């Protein structure tokens, strides 16, 4: 692909704005700012030990998880990049207990930005792919945000995306009109369109789950996974392979490219906490992307994007990816009701 014929993220968004007339200028600018922040995070991740950013920060986030230095740095990069542009009323991050209103000395906009600044950060020190996940909502109260402003079901998202920082850095985006992937060209510093209208195959022979928790799963998940593991001799009559990176962005990106089902179910260890993944920061944006690519995403009993949030850090079980497999494991859950 010659440099002259490349489509950068900025060009892509401008063309989409002209062609569809459903991408407001403020939203386009917001997405570009988020993408620039992801580029800065990618740069810091790539420095590794040379940048003195590896290791823990000696603190915990609101989830009770030990924060890595890069967790904190990535969070600061996203806040600093987005607070002054006039596109947002407020932001919320997995790393912060409460939401972040845009300071009074900056202009405010009509959007809300929700993000997991560095997903899969347990993999930082071992050089495995990690990433950033984000979601954009309209602020229902104009430019004055409260915590209630964020508590909208995923169906209200106007944009969602993620970046993967791996062998290449990629930026995957949907604004409700399909899913497109951009690769960071480090020589010119631009996100360049490399995959258009990505589609997840409806059928798959790959699944992603942390099998070390099998003894804690509820019966529908145990049944589903045992059938996959039984292979060609079992009830499915086919052989399946397990893939698990322990980095949601990396697992979902693989599924987006070649199919599969990603599962992070609730389990018996914490019956009062339905799942581990956060609805607002992880499940909703990934569900929007997966559905736009022809896949499906449920909690096992309900479409994820129809869940009414009750708190910024609410957790849900997650089953997403190839449509036929998600429908099967969801049916197993509903049989047990």
Swiss-Prot record:
GO biological process, one term: fructose metabolic process
UniProt catalytic activity: beta-D-fructose 1,6-bisphosphate + H2O = beta-D-fructose 6-phosphate + phosphate
InterPro entries, per database record: FBPase_C_dom (IPR044015), FBPase_class-1 (IPR000146), FBPase_N (IPR033391), FBPtase (IPR028343)
Any one GO MF annotation of this record: fructose 1,6-bisphosphate 1-phosphatase activity
Keywords: Carbohydrate metabolism, Cytoplasm, Hydrolase, Magnesium, Metal-binding
Pfam families the record matches: FBPase, FBPase_C
Taxonomic lineage: Bacteria, Pseudomonadati, Pseudomonadota, Betaproteobacteria, Burkholderiales
Subcellular localization(s) per the UniProt record: Cytoplasm
Gene name linked to the record: fbp
Binding site for Mg(2+) 1: 94, 116, 118
Gene Ontology CC annotations of this record: cytosol
Positions that bind substrate: 119-122, 210, 276
The protein's name in its UniProt record: Fructose-1,6-bisphosphatase class 1
Cofactor binding annotation: Binds 2 magnesium ions per subunit.
Annotated family: Belongs to the FBPase class 1 family.
EC number, as in UniProt: 3.1.3.11
EC primary class: hydrolase
Main subcellular localisation: cytoplasm
Binding-site residues for Mg(2+) 2, renumbered to this chain: 116, 119, 282
Self-association and partners: Homotetramer.
Pathway assigned to this chain's UniProt record: Carbohydrate biosynthesis; gluconeogenesis
NCBIfam families: PRK09293.1-1 (NF006778), PRK09293.1-3 (NF006779), PRK09293.1-4 (NF006780)
Reported cofactor(s): Mg(2+)
């Amino acid at each position: 692909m010659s440099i002259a014929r490349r489509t950068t993220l900025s060009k892509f968004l401008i063309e989409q704005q002209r062609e569809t007339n459903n991408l407001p200028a403020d939203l386009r600018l917001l997405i570009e700012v988020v993408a620039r922040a992801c580029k800065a995070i990618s740069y810091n991740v790539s420095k590794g030990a040379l940048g003195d950013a590896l290791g823990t920060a000696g603190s915990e986030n609101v989830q009770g998880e030990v924060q890595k230095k890069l967790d904190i740095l990535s969070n600061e990069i996203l806040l600093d990049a987005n607070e002054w542009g006039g596109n947002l009323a407020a932001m919320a991050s997995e790393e912060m207990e409460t939401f972040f209103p845009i300071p009074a000395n900056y202009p405010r906009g009509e959007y809300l930005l929700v993000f997991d600044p560095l997903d899969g950060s347990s993999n930082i020190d071992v050089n495995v792919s990690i990433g950033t996940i984000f979601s954009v909502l309209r602020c229902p109260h104009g430019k004055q945000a409260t915590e209630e402003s964020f508590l909208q079901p995923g169906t209200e998202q106007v944009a969602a995306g993620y970046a993967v920082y791996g062998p290449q850095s990629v930026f995957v985006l949907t604004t409700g009109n399909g899913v497109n992937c951009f690769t960071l060209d480090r020589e010119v510093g631009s996100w360049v369109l490399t995959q258009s209208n990505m589609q997840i195959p409806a059928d798959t022979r790959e699944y992603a789950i942390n099998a070390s928790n099998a003894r804690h799963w509820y019966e529908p998940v145990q049944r589903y996974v045992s059938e996959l593991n039984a292979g060609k001799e079992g009830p499915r009559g086919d052989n399946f392979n397990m893939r698990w990176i322990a980095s949601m962005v990396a697992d979902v990106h693989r599924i987006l490219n070649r199919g599969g089902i990603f599962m992070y179910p609730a389990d018996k260890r914490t019956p009062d906490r339905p799942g581990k993944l956060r609805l607002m920061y992880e499940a909703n944006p990934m569900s929007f992307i997966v559905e736009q690519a022809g896949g499906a995403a449920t909690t096992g009993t309900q479409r994820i994007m129809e869940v009414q949030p009750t708190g910024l850090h609410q957790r849900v079980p997650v089953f997403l990816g190839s449509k036929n497999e998600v429908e099967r494991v969801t049916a197993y859950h509903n049989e047990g009701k």
